[in-house]
């Protein structure tokens, strides 16, 4: 190990020391984040359809946070992610706050179109997200409040 490497701050994981460069390299890109976003987008849709506005809003908030994280770890996508958050998720949020299922559905469908357009713009046109035609089986969508 060089003197320069030895002087870099490290942190112990319980298994080994990691430098800041090691930690930076481990940060997930959109290939790891987007599947979670897709799952939450799916849950948001069916939660709203069942009038579980609290769960729908929670999923929306989590999607925003994941996209914001993606803007940090993959800044080349920042502009498109930011636009999607402001425009598409903004329209969905407005509809959720109004508890307007028809507006949620319309904004959600537009979001799918726009997301797939972003995939095309970023040379990832082979990724075409679609809404499953059934609700997620791993969560009770019944309103709890």
Region locations from a protein language model:
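C-terminal-biased regions
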Residues: 2-145
């Amino acid at each position: 190990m060089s003197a320069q490497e030895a002087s870099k701050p490290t942190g112990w994981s319980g298994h080994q020391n990691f430098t800041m460069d090691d930690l930076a390299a481990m940060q997930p890109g959109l290939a790891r984040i987007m599947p979670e976003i897709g799952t939450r987008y799916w849950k948001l849709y069916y939660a709203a359809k069942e009038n579980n506005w609290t769960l729908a809003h929670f999923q929306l908030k989590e999607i925003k946070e994941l996209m914001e994280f993606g803007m940090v770890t993959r800044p080349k996508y920042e502009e498109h992610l930011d636009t999607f958050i402001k425009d598409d998720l903004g329209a969905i949020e407005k509809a959720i706050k109004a508890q307007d299922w028809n507006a949620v559905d319309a904004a959600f469908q537009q979001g799918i179109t726009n997301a797939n357009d972003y995939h095309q713009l970023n040379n990832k046109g082979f990724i075409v997200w679609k809404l499953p035609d059934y609700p997620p089986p791993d969560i009770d969508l019944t309103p709890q409040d």
